[in-house]
Amino acid sequence: MTRSLAGAFAFATVMPVPSRRAAIAGRGVLTALPVVGLVLGSAAAAVCWLGTRAFGSGSVLAGALTVAVLLLATRGLHIDGLSDTTDALGCYGPAERALAVMRDGRAGPFGVAAVAVTVVIQSVAFSQAGWAAVLVAVAAGRVAVVVACRRGVPAAEGSTLGALVAGTQPLWVAAAWLVAIAGLATLAGERAWQGPLAVVVAVACSVVMVAHCVRRFGGITGDVLGAAVEVTTTVTALGLAIA
């Protein structure tokens, strides 16, 4: 379990973890990923709280700084996945053509637009919803990855990461993490039900997106998982920002 947790931090953050102490990406690392979300979320929540103290409650600067810290802490891994996935979904042709677009390192117009919209929405939503919402939204994004890698979900052809993690998570593990984060979310919204509902709706949106990617690409890839993180984080933050 310790190696899996270390592997999760090495995989999903900039934290320097000696390779001998970290497991490679696989079932255990994916199962531990929501723990990384809770730690990242706590750090981002602290930045949001400090930002509201410095710039005033509801300041977009606080939300923008929070998003910037998350991007730095994750090496932009997930937002890059969102960009590549959006470009691939926006192209014509068979799955092979779409996957080739996804693997191309250049960002196309769809990808750039998706990144811009996501950063703006997260910045505004975080500033409005507050630090507790940041913690829940970031953790929920990582739960979405566990759900996306549940049993029965295939990997896209040629995807190295997809082959390692697709279908590795028992349904009960995904459900347990979803219940845990939804329970935590009762403390984040204006109303007790608002947080859990935001988390469930956000993860459901991610499930729909991943299902579409499976139909389009033949399975999941690492980029699809990154997109799942960003979609879930954004929708959760939006739900918690509702007054």
UniProtKB/Swiss-Prot annotation:
Gene Ontology BP, a term: cobalamin biosynthetic process
UniProt-recorded Gene Ontology molecular function terms: adenosylcobinamide-GDP ribazoletransferase activity; cobalamin 5'-phosphate synthase activity
Keywords carried by this UniProt record: Cell membrane, Cobalamin biosynthesis, Magnesium, Membrane, Transferase, Transmembrane, Transmembrane helix
Topological relation to the membrane, as annotated: Multi-pass membrane protein
Family of this protein: Belongs to the CobS family.
Entry function: Joins adenosylcobinamide-GDP and alpha-ribazole to generate adenosylcobalamin (Ado-cobalamin). Also synthesizes adenosylcobalamin 5'-phosphate from adenosylcobinamide-GDP and alpha-ribazole 5'-phosphate.
Listed transmembrane segments: 29-49, 54-74, 107-127, 129-149, 161-181, 192-212
Essential cofactor(s): Mg(2+)
Enzyme Commission number(s) from the entry: 2.7.8.26
Name used for this protein in its record: Adenosylcobinamide-GDP ribazoletransferase
Pathway entry: Cofactor biosynthesis; adenosylcobalamin biosynthesis; adenosylcobalamin from cob(II)yrinate a,c-diamide: step 7/7
Primary localisation category: membrane
One Pfam family it belongs to: CobS
Any single Gene Ontology cellular-component annotation: plasma membrane
Keyword Transmembrane: yes
Cell compartment(s), UniProt: Cell membrane
Superkingdom assignment: Bacteria
Catalytic activity, as annotated: alpha-ribazole + adenosylcob(III)inamide-GDP = adenosylcob(III)alamin + GMP + H(+); alpha-ribazole 5'-phosphate + adenosylcob(III)inamide-GDP = adenosylcob(III)alamin 5'-phosphate + GMP + H(+)
Entry annotated with the keyword Transmembrane: yes
